[in-house]
Amino acid sequence: MSQRGGNDLLLEGVRRLGAVAIFLVQLLLESVPALSRPRLLVHQIYNAGARSLIIIMLSGLFVGMVLGLQAFNLLQRFGSEEALGTAAALGLLKELSPVITALLFAGRAGTALTSEIGLMRATDQLTAMEIMAVDPLRHVAAPRFLGGVVAMPLLTAIFSLIGLYGAQLIGVQLMGVDKGVFWSQMQGSVGLRDVTEGMVKSVVFGIACSLIAVHEGYHAEPTAAGVGLATTRTVVASSVITLLLDYVLTAAFL
Amino acid sequence: MVVDVRGLHYAVGGRPIFAGLDVQVRRGRITAIMGPSGTGKTTLLKLITAQIPADRGEVSVFGEDLAALGRRGIYALRKRLGMLFQNGALLTDLDVFENVAFPVREHTDLPEALIYKLVLTKLQAVGLRGAAGLMPGELSGGMARRVALARAIVMDPELLIYDEPFVGLDPISLGVILRLIKHMNEALGITSIVVSHDVHQLATIAHDSYLLSGGRVAAAGPPAQLRARRASDSAAVRQFMTGSEDGPVAFHYPAPDYAAQLFAAEE
């Protein structure tokens, strides 16, 4: 009995994964014509990106400050405080910035996307578009997906920048690490490959989080409870997938 | 014939909604689809607009069998019809003007000056030219439905479908909507399908009417005729036309014996 229950669960999982994969292919196909409407796309980049700026910048500053404090404390035990710049940069660029940005994106922009599309479904707006011979996948889903994919690497870069400033603020201004050493160590030991790793991660997270948010909204049950459930699923699924993909990508880059 | 439904069968989760339905909508006329709640009136609209496929039978619109049309064909066909949703279904991130302009921008390359004039003309027709700058959230229910009507006619459709256009309107808005439906039909020659359970309002505008019951057409003909020949009709038709509580459609949902259930709770 439990064996059968397990099989059903597995089948359901595979079925859902398949549905999301098909949806991704449809989105990518519709993304090409969506690119010909830059106004819609720019609006969505603004929605997903610019409107997340404050939370990303604030979080970046605090994460950088904590990183500066912890790393300084750890490095001091081995007498190598001058490596603080390198530690902060590598930690931020390769791991913390892409992962935390993706988690914040899921909570801020992802939920907004899901609930907006879900409510459009619940209030017949998507059906109305279909009756007007306008494909909602092309007009609603694809620009929002692309907007998220473009916004994520930009937000990640901003997070890294502010995070480094935060680490410098604590390490150099408060703890007294030499400013020149802080920046020159960083410059000497952080390579393009490290930056690329973070950027590749942010693009992959951007695709995953935007896909989940748009998919959940587009297929939400058209009720208040249905939209609420879809929004919750967006946050949970995006967070878990982000952390899983982070491991896979980190292993791939080693 | 604009819409021709023949021998339509449709079931949801094994429960039959339509079992051999026949409905014909003639060009240039207002056809009313009536019936108590849950008889599948809205489902019929979904079938006519190709949102869902029929299980069996044929649905033809403008002489084309919907089952034989691909996605492109269905979209091409939809460009020839307009639909007014119960709640208006206006796009909430666009203002009134942009809502009405939406189908024009999507399907044509008209210059901005022409779109401006076209949209204002349609808004003037529904009496809301002055509300062009408002957002959908700022409109009353009746106004939202009129904007949706302007949007539905902006591409000059041959067929207009109204889904429960009278629900929840005050007497003034109701009068306005009734007048507009009649006007669209008479002045523009648009064939109209009006789905509603409001027998009295429909009787004032519809040329033909169908009363659905039990998945089939229970009665058909001009609304006045339907009301007049009550005596010869089935109990279901009589109950619907007179709004009686007693009849085949029971007031009480099936339940165990009332007294037995009350006393069982005490024990």
PLM features per residue range, with description:
Chain A
Residues 44, 48-100, 104:
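Active-site cofactor/substrate anionic-group-binding motifs, chiefly glycine-
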Residues 44, 135-156, 230:
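Start (N-cap) of specific transmembrane helices in multi-pass transporter permeases
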